[in-house]
Amino acid sequence: MSERQPQILDLEQVIKSKAGKKAKYIPKFVINWFKKFVHIDFINEYLKEGYVGVEFCENAVKYLGVELEIAGLENLPKDGRTYTFVSNHPLGAIDGVTLGAVIGRQYDGKIKYMLNDLLMNLKGMAPLGIPVNKLGGQARNLPKLVNEVYHSDNQMLVFPAGLCSRKIDGKIQDVEWGKSFIKKSRETGRDIVPSIGPDHLYAYRLSAAFR
């Protein structure tokens, strides 16, 4: 069990840090609106518990009241090797915490994600993440960080679309997947294990209501 790290997330500071010199142009009411939009009080109530790593994911699932129906768990490899687990991305952040909870528990917490760098502000998620900037240029050391993880003893969790699923021609589907995970998996001798989350309209609309 990891040592707990209770946290109160200062969302205003996160926004200002991300915006840099442009922060002074962001009206206060916009920041206040965004706090309500992301339910920051609800988030901070959970962050006070201080869960870290896979425990953060597992308890976030419980806190959100999500009931998981998992099929094929018995098929997960248990041969001591490392794998690349790939998944569609229909529901947003909840995809990450649920996949992390399930895969992380099966592999003793030895998992890593490619994470939106904003999520690295969550102490509980940060140890699991490789930060990816969705709003600007990438850090120069990103290729090095990715390479290190693929060569490590961690299981790699990847959402190849890089974005949440979209409604396209009346169907909920991922945008085109990036292929770098295939190249890196080949280079490091990792087999790729696919998984799939709910892609029906009801789940999509429900998740969209909370985005």
PLM segments and residue spans:
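Amphipathic coiled-coil/heptad-repeat helices and related helical stalk/stem segments
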Residues: 69, 139-143, 177-178
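Catalytic core of membrane glycerolipid acyltransferases/transacylases, capturing the structured
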Residues: 29, 39, 80-137
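Short, flexible loop segments at the rims of nucleotide/cofactor-binding pockets, characterized by
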Residues: 46, 60-66, 132-138, 170-171
